[in-house]
């Protein structure tokens, strides 16, 4: 797996497709595109907490088959990247720097960054620190003001188990690593990888996040001009729909897309993938000012609409926000609140 160095640590990534797609019969959904000219429509997919880039492989293949140059990344402490036990190496802002470091390494001036949960907040950190490097953002399941308490209640017991119960968790990891990957479906392995990995570094990741900011302050989010598609769903206390709706209203060029459930993009991805692909077509079809060109394969730095809902498709104007539901659910008009 290719990688680059960030603060003397290895960060792993994978590239999919781009330009005229060469479709093969390999991949998580039985198809993928493997031609990858670096200059064509780069899209970087960032995983969730303690997960790996494998969670985004099916989506990466689908978007690559539509002519995008898709890159998935394992943030430090995750997947195939280095996993140090030092909690000070982990924070949302540092994760944002790692994504920008990947862009520098690949010589990418601007990219669309899509992140899920931890990855969503990482994208917001990039919008804060390096907005000129973003062509657009796809923010799936952000964790903001309304999800903090549920997140603390969920991850504190996990942190205790990973830290004070490390010997027992190591035994559990060894046992689950004995399960052959070929016996499980793709997302079965993605979930089981949570337990297969060594517990010490995972605990350090959570500790580092607990001691840093979770996302840019809302007063700062109001200033972000990057076009954004915000995905949210109901019945999830860690990623409440209210956070997604709030963020879509805060972002001047934000748009809200309602998912049917937590797993729709993974289990029944066609509708949401179409919406994401249309958003990519939109942002790459309109010119934006670009940052100073990054050197090709340079070493990474060591430094730091909501509009009315109708049965018609969502308008593709970057400055408007729209809520998109399944066709059967598009009968009611939603008045903009706040």
Ranges and model annotations:
Residues 29, 72-112:
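Active-site loop/oxyanion-hole signature of alpha/beta-hydrolase fold enzymes
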Residues 253-302, 306, 336-338:
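Catalytic active-site module of serine/aspartate enzymes centered on a nucleophile-bearing elbow/loop
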Residues 115-119, 123:
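Gly/Ala-rich beta-loop-alpha elbow adjacent to hydrolase catalytic centers
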Residues 124, 128-129, 134-164:
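Flexible "cap/lid" loop of the alpha/beta hydrolase fold
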Residues 237-243:
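Conserved alpha/beta-hydrolase "acid-adjacent" motif
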């Amino acid at each position: 797996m290719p990688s680059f160095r960030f603060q003397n640590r290895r960060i792993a990534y994978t590239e999919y497709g781009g330009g005229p797609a060469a479709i093969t019969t390999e991949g998580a959904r039985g198809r993928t595109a493997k031609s990858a000219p670096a200059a064509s429509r780069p899209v970087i997919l960032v995983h969730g907490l303690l997960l790996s880039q494998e969670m985004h492989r099916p989506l990466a293949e689908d978007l690559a088959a539509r002519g995008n140059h898709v890159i998935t990344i394992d943030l430090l402490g995750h997947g195939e990247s280095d996993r140090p036990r030092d909690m000070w190496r982990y924070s949302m802002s540092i994760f944002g720097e790692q994504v920008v470091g990947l862009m520098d390494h690949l010589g990418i001036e601007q990219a669309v960054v899509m992140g899920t949960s931890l990855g969503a907040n990482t994208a917001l950190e990039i919008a804060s620190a390096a907005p000129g490097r973003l062509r657009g953002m796809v923010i799936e399941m952000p964790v903001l003001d309304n999800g903090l308490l549920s997140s603390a209640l969920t991850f504190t017991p996990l942190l205790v188990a990973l830290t004070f119960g490390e010997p027992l968790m190591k035994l559990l990891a060894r046992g689950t690593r004995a399960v052959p990957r070929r016996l499980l479906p793709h997302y079965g392995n993605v979930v089981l990888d949570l337990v297969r990995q060594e517990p010490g570094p995972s605990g350090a990741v959570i500790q580092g996040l607990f001691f840093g900011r979770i996302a840019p302050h809302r007063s700062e989010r109001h200033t972000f001009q990057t076009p954004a598609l915000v995905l949210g769903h109901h019945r999830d206390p860690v990623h409440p729909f209210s956070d997604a709706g709030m963020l879509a209203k805060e972002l001047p060029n934000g748009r809200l897309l309602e998912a049917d459930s937590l797993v729709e993009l993974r289990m029944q991805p066609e509708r949401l993938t179409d919406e994401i692909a249309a958003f990519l077509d939109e942002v790459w079809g309109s010119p934006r000012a670009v940052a100073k060109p990054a050197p090709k394969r340079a070493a990474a730095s060591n430094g730091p609409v909501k509009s009315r809902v109708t049965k018609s498709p969502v308008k593709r104007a970057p400055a408007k926000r729209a809520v998109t539901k399944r066709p059967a659910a598009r009968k009611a008009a939603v008045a903009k609140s706040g």
